[in-house]
Amino acid sequence: HTHLREPGFSYKETIKTGSMAGAKAGYTDLCTMPNLNPAPDNAEHLKAQTDIIGRDAVIHVLPFGTITKERKGVGEIIDFESIADRVAGFSDDGTGVQNEELMKQAMTKCAKLGKIISAHCEVNDLLKGGYIHDGAYAKTHNHKGICSESEWAQIERDCRLAEETGCQYHVCHISTKESVDIIRKAKARGVRVTCETGPHYLTMCDEDLQEDGRFKMNPPLRAAQDKQALIEGVLDGTIDVIATDPVSYTHLTLPTKASV
């Protein structure tokens, strides 16, 4: 789960530099997310990425295709069959799939193709301009908060759809106690679901925030009880992977507190 930024954003990162960093760290394979320009939502756009991978990657780099056209999270699903043999799976990472019927269509297709759906879970209508967790720190310091439901509501929906369709489903960077509970229960029912969290969600919470923006991330650092639930999820096997989700920004493009 990496963001190698090419094509479209090579001033932030390239496939060459990202794969070199991976090799230096001991990785032999990287999966790169589709928040690119053009987004890999058809064979032509995917080829723009795989041509660079073939030329510049120093280790095995596996692209993800998008779920929706232009990675919008709304509108139409892509033609999965046209690129399924050249991608690790499908994701709109950076954007949540907002429509239940779209996600059901996508999961139905991917179940037939034997491909995984890897989801960034975020309900746009619940963000309300927030940029840190909607907890005590946000209220005390008069900041706009992001509620936990904006994450877990889509996970709850998707686990149900994965159960209905038989799709293999992976949840990116979970951060809330509710997410852990939903996934734990889904696994107990036999749903084909896996998930990851980041090391920062296991080691910090919104009590660690300061007024210098140094811990700006999405999902945000949640409450102490969320951190504890994530730790318990790692220990009992509910959480399958601790993933760093590396993503490069330039100083000028680093999101400010008012943007997500």
Write out the residue ranges for each language-model feature.
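Histidine-centered divalent metal-coordination motifs
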Residues: 1-5, 120, 173, 251
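Metal-associated gating/positioning segment near the N- to mid-region
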Residues: 2-56
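Structural motif
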Residues: 7, 33, 64, 93, ...
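A glycine-rich helix N-cap at a beta->alpha junction
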Residues: 54-66
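Active-site beta->alpha loop and helix N-cap motifs at the rims of alpha/beta catalytic domains
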Residues: 68-72
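Histidine/acidic residue-rich metal-binding segments in metalloenzymes
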Residues: 75-242, 247
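Conserved small/polar residues in nucleotide/adenosyl-binding loops
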Residues: 250-256
